[in-house]
């Protein structure tokens, strides 16, 4: 009797266990299915940009649920956990310049794995160039940024804006006195000095990761730029330079578009113009161009391809870029947006469009990580310590080569 009862209890337990397993399995499949339709996107953008993206991506509900998560340490976090599908995001919205780092880590998927390459022809060529690493496009461009030539109309009238660097130099000589400066910039910061170097056809770093600090063109740029630096304050920090312009102590500057709302809020009638042409070369000052857009992690491309494609296609809507231009002065990456009044009526956006004709996409190769410090030290030696340009450039070139070699 006891054996029959025990046998019956064991049978019931087995049935219960199997049923529980089946229920658990069904529940697990539901979770997995739901997870396939949830996309987490990391970003580091200001609220105005994030709100436009969020509003557009909410249109994908209920098919796709997008979690837009602001991450202040985005780049370092991706280096640490980008290969862990349990911790990493599915996509991230950021500038193009870290593409090479993450591609070499093996954590990125080419955009063309999901969107056919021919459909990307709607984007400006230089935005796609910025998004390309070793022949693969790893970013869907959304908007871009360049530095701008800005001036305070209280001092510099529209018809006085220098067309060439020699005109700018003359203006600086005539208007630099008594605590006022005709022109200021972060002259010893690589991101700003790059415009002068590029304008001389020099280079900080080539597309293949080779530094060009000791080239004839780069040395010529540093020597020419030095005479402008001599008419600027020695302090080159962001806060100091921008405060001089914002407070009306500097008549003009080269700065990012993010400065415009600040100086307007301060009551300035600010103008933006094309970069002055360098008399020595016939090229305008040609700053770096940073392209902001969406990137796809390999794990998401493999396991959530349908949801990822829907997100990408949502962000390919030109209205997103137009809305970003209106909300935050972002310059659209799509050519067609420049046919729309909402874009062409924005002088800051159109000034970036003009500057982009000659801007150089910031290098996206991993070697660029070591160049910022090397070039910063070079600029300090030349501009602030008065060291010989040629000798300093050659020493910086050797340092860069050694640091790059240690990376490989």
Residue map of PLM features:
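Periplasmic solute-binding protein
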Residues: 97-107, 125-163, 169, 186-207, ...
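Hinge/lid segment of periplasmic solute-binding proteins
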Residues: 75, 95-148, 163-169, 177, ...
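Extracytoplasmic "Venus flytrap"/periplasmic binding protein-like
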Residues: 59-123, 154, 159, 251-252, ...
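Long, aromatic- and glycine/proline-rich binding clefts that accommodate carbohydrate-like moieties
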Residues: 325-381, 405-407
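A structural signal for short loop-to-beta-strand junctions that line the ligand-binding cleft
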Residues: 79-80, 87-90, 118-151, 181-182, ...
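Glycine-centered hinge/linker elements that transmit conformational signals in sensory
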Residues: 171-176, 210-237
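Extracytoplasmic/periplasmic substrate-recognition and gating elements
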Residues: 59, 65, 223, 230-233, ...
């Amino acid at each position: 009797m006891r054996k029959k009862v025990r046998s019956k209890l064991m049978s019931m337990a087995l049935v219960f266990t199997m049923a529980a397993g089946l229920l658990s399995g069904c529940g697990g499949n539901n979770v997995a299915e739901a997870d396939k339709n949830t996309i987490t996107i990391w970003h580091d953008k200001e609220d105005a940009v994030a709100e436009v993206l969020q509003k557009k991506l909410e249109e994908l509900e209920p098919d796709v649920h997008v979690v837009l998560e602001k991450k202040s340490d985005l780049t370092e976090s991706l280096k640490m956990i980008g290969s862990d599908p349990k911790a990493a995001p599915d996509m991230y919205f950021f500038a193009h310049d870290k593409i090479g780092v993450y591609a070499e880590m093996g954590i990125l998927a080419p955009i063309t794995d999901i969107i056919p390459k021919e459909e990307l022809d709607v984007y400006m060529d230089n935005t796609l160039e910025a998004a390309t690493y070793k022949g693969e496009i790893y970013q869907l461009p959304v908007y871009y940024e360049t530095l701008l030539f800005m001036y305070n109309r209280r001092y510099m009238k529209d018809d006085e804006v220098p067309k060439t660097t020699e005109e700018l130099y003359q203006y600086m000589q005539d208007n630099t006195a008594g605590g006022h400066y005709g022109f200021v910039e972060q002259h010893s910061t690589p991101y700003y000095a790059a415009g002068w170097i590029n304008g001389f056809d020099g280079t900080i770093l080539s597309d293949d990761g080779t530094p060009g600090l000791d080239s004839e063109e780069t040395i010529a740029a540093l020597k020419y730029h030095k005479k402008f630096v001599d008419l600027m304050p020695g302090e080159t920090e962001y806060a100091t330079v921008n405060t001089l312009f914002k407070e009306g102590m500097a008549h003009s500057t080269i700065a990012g578009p993010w400065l415009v709302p600040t100086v307007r809020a301060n009551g300035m009638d600010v103008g933006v113009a094309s970069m002055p042409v360098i008399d020595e070369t016939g090229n305008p000052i040609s700053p770096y161009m940073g392209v902001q857009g969406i990137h796809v992690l390999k794990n998401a491309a493999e396991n959530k391809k349908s949801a990822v494609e829907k997100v990408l296609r949502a962000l390919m809507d030109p209205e997103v870029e137009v809305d970003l231009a209106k909300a935050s002065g972002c310059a659209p990456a799509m050519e067609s947006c420049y046919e729309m009044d909402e874009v062409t009526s924005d002088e800051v956006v159109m000034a970036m469009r003009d500057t982009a004709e000659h801007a150089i996409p910031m290098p996206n190769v991993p070697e660029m990580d070591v160049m910022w410090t090397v070039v910063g030290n070079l600029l300090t030696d030349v501009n602030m310590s008065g060291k010989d340009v040629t000798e300093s450039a050659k020493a910086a070139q050797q340092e860069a080569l050694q640091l790059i070699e240690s990376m490989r």
